[in-house]
Amino acid sequence: MLLLRWPTFCCLWVFGLGQLEQTELSVTRATDESAQISCIVSLPYFSNTAIHWYRQKAKKFEYLIYVSTNYNQRPLGGKNKKIEASKDFQTSTSTLKINYLKKEDEATYYCAVCRSGTSWVKIFAKGTKLVVIPP
């Protein structure tokens, strides 16, 4: 759980409070293609909100990447850019892109934000299942 260290240390976990929406229940793509998963964020101050992306395979919940206040994508996976996250400020949407798909990328992917109030709460969307099929 090393990957979950800093994004989750101060947050309670809450799923599906309606402030984040992943409209596709599942996405199917062939091996070696790319998949995009979108997350509509209905929160004030979208431009200042960091969007975090996770995936769950079996019982393993893994932190992947985040995109914050700027337009720049934050790639993961070196020069190959296996995983990228971006924000569209016009539509209040964050998109996760998984490139060079392999069978091991098959999982349920979740977007999340951390919101403050009397305490920090991490809010999750309901998730999108990625299915990877042979070419």
UniProtKB/Swiss-Prot annotation:
One Gene Ontology cellular component annotation held by this UniProt entry: T cell receptor complex
Keyword Transcription appears in the UniProt entry: no
One Pfam family of this chain: V-set
This protein's record includes keyword NAD: no
Region of interest: J segment: 115-135
Keywords: Adaptive immunity, Immunity, Immunoglobulin domain, Receptor, Signal, T cell receptor
One of the protein's GO biological processes: adaptive immune response
Family matches, as Gene3D superfamilies: Immunoglobulins
InterPro entries for this protein: Ig-like_dom, Ig-like_dom_sf, Ig-like_fold, Ig_sub, Ig_V-set, TRG_var/const_region
Signal peptide start-end: 1-18
Name recorded for this polypeptide: T-cell receptor gamma chain V region 5/10-13
Species, as recorded: Mus musculus (Mouse)
Phylogenetic placement of the source organism: Eukaryota, Metazoa, Chordata, Craniata, Vertebrata
